[in-house]
Design a protein with these regions (language model features):
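Terminal-region recognition feature
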Residues: 1-118, 124, 129-131, 135-151, ...
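A short, charged helix-loop
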Residues: 155-157
Length: 319
């Protein structure tokens, strides 16, 4: 967030749950820090699970704080950002470990396409809360710390007797294989920086336009270098990213799902300061042939553009 813009909500809340063994427990903020702030001067709502408090697990007040926050975000028409680092449901307590999570899922779905919902994983996201990132518009993961799974390596080993590493469920796995992850940051700081960049391409809600940025490039600049990038021989592959860099403002292209179905490129850019969604064939990968993963990637991206009033620009070179 921009400096000195965070306003916390529900800071005085503590856990209302009781352990099964009857012992009392202390959970400041019930393991969730929520509130509003600004990113580049625009208001956003932020939810962060606190792993130092009962592993960031989901308790009743924890869930209620999020539910109230996303309802406020939808009413105000501002983006909702998650910072997740959670062990999932609060096991060992008398109240239902996943109390309120059905309401949580319902509100994520209800407000999908109305306000941008961005989930940022910078630690484990396990069990019931692992569904939440998949319901958001975008998921960003830290390569060093993020893991997304329902059970994890130990549960998988107990069920199948198969030993697997922590890389299963990590950022690279969900980028390359499942396609769940949209953007990978090298570490927490890099992931947060990319989240701010992503927000700069999105409107505050479905009723507004994306933010305009004054370009430093001349709109009539010479792009004849494209002729040296695109070969005359149709059978010769090339990297479409080079063409994109020549066309967009300030060579600034923010790619979505770069490691998934790489024969199709999707991402955000600006033309003369206006935000566009860009979809392009990439002849350098599999001859840019469109298959099922590429179709899923395209369709999901198109849904976001349609919801948030972002024009689509398509570069086609495919068999």
């Amino acid at each position: 967030l921009d400096p000195d813009t965070f306003s916390e909500l529900g800071a005085g809340v503590n856990t209302t749950g009781t352990r099964i063994d009857g012992r009392a427990s202390d959970a400041p903020c019930d393991g969730a820090v929520v509130g509003t702030g600004k990113v580049d001067g625009r208001k956003v709502a932020v939810y962060a699970s606190d792993f130092t408090v009962l592993g960031g697990s989901l308790g009743c007040q924890h869930g209620m704080k999020f539910i109230k926050l996303i309802e406020m975000a939808a009413a105000w028409g501002i983006p909702m950002v998650w910072l997740l680092d959670s062990s999932g449901g609060r096991l060992g307590y008398q109240d239902v470990p996943s109390a309120g999570i059905d309401w949580w899922f319902a509100l994520e779905s209800r407000y999908s396409g109305l306000i941008p919902q961005i989930n940022v994983l910078m630690g484990p996201c396990i069990a019931g809360q692992a569904y939440c990132p998949t319901l958001c518009d975008f998921l960003l993961m830290s390569r060093e710390t993020a893991h997304l799974w329902l059970g994890g390596p130990r549960m998988t080993q107990a069920a199948t007797s198969e030993t697997i590493g922590d890389n299963v469920g990590g950022a690279d796995y969900h980028m390359e294989y499942s396609g769940t992850c949209d953007v990978v940051g090298q570490n927490d700081r890099d992931t947060i920086a990319k989240t701010r960049t992503l927000l700069s391409f999105l409107p505050s809600n479905c009723r507004t336009k994306p933010p305009y940025t004054e370009p430093t490039d001349d709109v009539y600049r010479d792009v004849s270098a494209i002729a040296q990038v695109v070969p005359d021989n149709y059978d010769q592959p090339y990297d479409m990213h080079a063409v994109i860099q020549l066309l967009v403002d300030d060579q600034n292209f923010f790619e979505i799902k770069p490691g998934y179905a790489a024969q199709l490129i999707t991402g955000f850019a600006r033309f003369n300061g206006e935000v566009v969604g860009l979809v392009a064939s990439n002849p350098g990968v599999a001859g840019s042939a469109t298959e099922i993963d590429a179709c899923d990637k395209y369709y999901r991206f198109l849904q976001v553009l349609d919801a948030y009033n972002i024009p689509l620009v398509t570069l086609v070179d495919t068999p």
